[in-house]
Amino acid sequence: MTAQLELVLRKYDLELTPDEQVTIWDEVAFYHEVNQSYFDQDEDEALGSPQEDERLIYEIEDLVDSCITKESKTRTITFSEDQLWIIHDVLREKEELYSSTYDRYQDEDDLEVVDKEGNLIGIWGDIYKKIKEAINGQH
């Protein structure tokens, strides 16, 4: 008796405004830039899969609009589960950074990104909520 391995690729549809698309592009590109040393590592030296993560980042950048034009519109974009987790991790890292700096310095400018409890707000919070709902199966 032979066992068959079935590969299940989970896909998630997110309805994103032009602003949300540009924000995702900006955040993922910035994350890629500031973590370049991780992406430059050999697979056997790194924790994780730098080349795979970098490939996913390029795919995300290809899916969303990088700038708003007069033709920009809200679109439903289909992401793979791995792509969605990359965006989730990028936003979670932003949330952790801004909440920790607000806790230390009480800088009101940080409150444009996180609330006093340290949760993402504004466009970042909207995107983060959509991703968490998609991953958790809530529509």
Give the positions of each predicted feature.
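Positively charged, low-complexity terminal tracts
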Residues: 1-139
